[in-house]
A protein has these predicted regions:
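Class I SAM-dependent methyltransferase Rossmann-like catalytic core
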Residues: 44-70
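Conserved class I S-adenosyl-L-methionine
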Residues: 78-87
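A short glycine-rich, Lys/Arg-flanked "PGG" loop and its adjoining helix->strand segment in the class I
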Residues: 96, 170-183
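S-adenosyl-L-methionine
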Residues: 117-145
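A short acidic, Gly/Pro-enriched loop at the edge of an enzyme's catalytic core
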Residues: 144-154
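A conserved beta-strand element that flanks and buttresses the S-adenosyl-L-methionine
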Residues: 155-159
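Conserved beta-strand signature within the Rossmann-like core of class I S-adenosyl-L-methionine
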Residues: 184-192
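Core SAM-dependent methyltransferase catalytic element
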Residues: 237-260
Length: 260
C-alpha cells in the first residue's frame, strides 16, 4: 500500500497499525530475552567468589558450601525468589546475586528477630548486592502479602524445624507457600536430620527434624518431591545431640526439592 496516496485518515490508521505491530514485536522480544535469561545458569562459582562479599559470609561458606546449594536450587537471572526464615540474610544475598539485575528476592523474617541478625540483614539492604532484596517482616504462616505471587523459587534453609515449636500453623504456612509459587515453581528445604521416628518432636531440644516427617507435611499442601541433595549428608552423625550451639563434629543435613 502506498502511504503517500492515502487520505489523511487512512494514513493515520495505517501508521497506528504499524506502531502497534512494532510494540507487540518489542514486547515479544523482551519476553523471549527474559525467558532465555531464566533458562541460563549464571556462573555460580564466580558469584560465590565475588570480592565484595563479607568476610563473615566467607567464614559461613566453610561449613555451608553454598556452591552445591546454588547448583541444586538453580536460581536464574530475572527470577522472583522468596527466602523463608532469612535471618541475617546470608542465603538471601546469595540468591539476590544470582537473580540480578532484573530479579528480586523477598527475605522473610518473623517479628522479633534477634537484634544481631536484624542488623546484619538491614546492612545488606544498603549494599549494591542487596538492591534487589525486599524485606518481609511477617509471620511464618502468612509469609507473603497478596501481591507477591507467581514466585519461581522458595528457599527454606535450616529453619523449618524451628516452626515445630513456635506458634505457627504449619499446614497454613505450607498452603500459603504453594499458592505463592507459579505452576512448576520450586520449593527447596534444607534442615538438620533427626533420627527415624523422631518426627517433629526434637525441633526445640535438638534443633532437628526427620526428613520423612517434613516431606509428609509439604506433600499434604500439594507439592511433589522432585529431587534430593546428598551433598550435606554425614551418615556418621548419631543424630542424638543438639546442633545449637554448633557442635565441633559433622551434622547430617538433608536437602529436598519440591515442585508445584
Amino acid at each position: 500500500m502506498d502511504v503517500i496516496n492515502m487520505t489523511g485518515k487512512a494514513a493515520l490508521h495505517y501508521a497506528a497499525m504499524l506502531s502497534s505491530a512494532v510494540a507487540v514485536l518489542v514486547v515479544a522480544r523482551v519476553a523471549v530475552a527474559q525467558d532465555s535469561a531464566k533458562n541460563s545458569a549464571p556462573n555460580y562459582a564466580a558469584l560465590v567468589a565475588a570480592p565484595d562479599r563479607t568476610e563473615a559470609d566467607r567464614q559461613t561458606d566453610q561449613r555451608r558450601d553454598p556452591l552445591q546449594l546454588l547448583v541444586f536450587a538453580a536460581p536464574r537471572p530475572g527470577m522472583k525468589v522468596l527466602d523463608m526464615g532469612a535471618g541475617g540474610g546470608y542465603s538471601t544475598e546469595l540468591m539476590a546475586r544470582t537473580v540480578a539485575p532484573t530479579g528480586v528476592v523477598y527475605g522473610q523474617n518473623p517479628d522479633g528477630l534477634g537484634e544481631r541478625a536484624k542488623a546484619r540483614f538491614e546492612a545488606r539492604l544498603k549494599t549494591p548486592a542487596g538492591q534487589n532484596i525486599v524485606s518481609l517482616v511477617r509471620p511464618f504462616d502468612d509469609p507473603v502479602p497478596p501481591e507477591v505471587r507467581e514466585l519461581d523459587l522458595i528457599t527454606f534453609l535450616f529453619f523449618y524445624h524451628d516452626t515445630t515449636y513456635m506458634p505457627v500453623d504449619r499446614a497454613a504456612m505450607n498452603r500459603k507457600l504453594y499458592a505463592a509459587l507459579k505452576p512448576g515453581g520450586a520449593l527447596v528445604i534444607a534442615d538438620h536430620s533427626a533420627k527415624a521416628g523422631d518426627g517433629t518432636a526434637v525441633g526445640k531440644t535438638l534443633h532437628r527434624i526427620e526428613d520423612e516427617a517434613l516431606r509428609r507435611e509439604i506433600e499434604i499442601a500439594g507439592f511433589k518431591l522432585v529431587g534430593q541433595g546428598d551433598f550435606w549428608r554425614h551418615p556418621e552423625d548419631t543424630r542424638d545431640f543438639s546442633i545449637q550451639p554448633p557442635p565441633n563434629k559433622p551434622v547430617d543435613e538433608f536437602v529436598l526439592k519440591f515442585q508445584k
